[in-house]
Amino acid sequence: MKAHLLLFMRIIYIHRCPLNEVAPPGQVVEVFGKAIQALSRVSDELWLDPSEKGLALRSVNSCRSAYGCVLFSPVFFQHYQWSASVKMNDTDIILNLNCRLGMKSILPIFRCLNSLEKNVEKCKIFTRSDKCKVVIQFFCRHGIKKIHNVCFQGSRPLQVIFQKNMCANTLVIQPRVLAEAIVLFTSSQEEVTLAVTPLKVCIKSSNEESMDLTDSVYSEMFVGPDEFDFFQIGIDTEITFCFKELKGVLTFSEAIHAPIAIHFDFPGKPMALSIDDMLLEANFILATLADEPSRASSLQTLYLSQKQRRSEPIHSNSKAGKNITSKVPEYISRKVEPKRLYSNETPTNISTLENCGSPLMKRANKDITEVPESDGNLSEVPESSVSDTEDVPGSPCLKKFSCMFFGAASSDQQEPFSLPFQSLATASGSEEDMNNGSFSTF
C-alpha cells in the first residue's frame, strides 16, 4: 500500500537565516503546530490537502463562513511525497483522497509546542489510506519515539474565491505592533471594530452602546500611518469583525516573524488577513458586520466620490530617505521611523440595561451559495436568489452578520491563493469553548 502523503520535517527549513544557518527541527514543528492552532480558532475540523504546490491545511466553520488556509511549500519539508489518487487494496476503486480530521483529535498533539521544540529531532507524517488513518511520529532525544494515529474521513476540501487585491483599503503591519494595539481587549471580547482614515487607524471595542455592567470598559487604540509597512486607504470606513480569528492569525504571525496584510472594503463585505512568507502562505477570510442598507449605499457613493478625488497611490522610498512630496496622496505611506502608540480607554456609564442588544443588522445580499445538484456536486446560485438573514448563535445580543456560502468544493487540485476570493463569513464560536463544538459536515 503506497502512502498517500509522506512528510519529513527536520533541519532543512530555513527562515530568515543566513545561508549557512538553519532553523532547529523543533522550531519547524512549532511553526506547523502554530498553523494548526490558528486554524482551530476557525473550525472544529481540519483538512489535509496535498498537491504539487505543497501541503495545504484548510479549515472552515460549521456555518461555512470563516475560512482559513495555510499552504506549506514542498521545500518547507525535508521530504515531501504525495499522490493524486489512491488505489484501495481490497477494491479496484481509485479515490482522490483528502483527509478531514477532527480538531479535537489533532490539536492535543501539537498543544505543548514548547516541549516539542526542545525535544523533537524529526517529525514524520504519512497516511494509511487502507485504514483511514493519519500517522504522526515524533523522533525525540534519547531515542524516544512517539506515534499518534488519527482517524480521518475522505472529503473534498473547500475552495474559496475572494479577490483581495481589489479591496479599497490595504494595511500591512508587523505582529509586534498589532499585538500592542489589541493588548487592551479582554479575552471575553467577541468583536472589535477597525476604523480607518487617511490620518490614523483606530482599533476599538465594538457596540459601545450595548455594553452592560459586566463589560463596562470601552477601549480604543490609535495607530499612526508611520507604524505600518504599507498604508493605503481608499475609503474612510469602519468594519466590525470577530476577534477570535484575529488573535489566532496574530499568534501564527509572531511565530514566523512575518507581517500581516489586512484587506477590506465596506461594512458587510468580507475582509482578508494574509501572511506571505518565503516557504508558506496563509489566508483567512472573515465576515464583517453588515450595516443598514441606507448606510451601505451611502458608503458606496462616498467611495466613488473619494476614488475620483484621490489619485493612484505613489509609494515613498523610506530606505532612500526620500520625503513625501505634495504629489503623493496622503492616504498611502511607507513605514518610516516608528512612533509611540497612544491609547484612549474610558469607562462607560450605562443608564439602562433593558435593551442591551446591538441594533439589528441586515444581511448583505449574497453573491453565491452552494446547493446540492442531483449528482451530488455543488453549483453556484445567482445573487438575486439569495436574500435571507441568519442569527449568530451563542450571542445574547441580536446581531446579523453578512454571510454567504463559499464556492463549490472540488477534488481538482487548485492553487488556493492564485484564485480571487469572493466570500463572506460569520463569527465562529468562543475560543474558550473550542472543544465543546460538534464536527461540521459538508
Swiss-Prot record:
One of its GO terms (biological process) is mitotic intra-S DNA damage checkpoint signaling. Residues 370-392, 422-442 are annotated as: Disordered. Interacts with HUS1, HUS1B, RAD1, RAD9A and RAD17. The modification Phosphoserine is found at residue 387. The lineage of its organism: Eukaryota, Metazoa, Chordata, Craniata, Vertebrata. It comes from Bos taurus. GO terms for cellular component: checkpoint clamp complex. InterPro entries: DNA_clamp_sf (IPR046938), Rad9 (IPR026584), Rad9/Ddc1 (IPR007268). Belongs to the rad9 family. CDD domains: PCNA. Keywords: Phosphoprotein. Pfam families: Rad9. This is Cell cycle checkpoint control protein RAD9B.
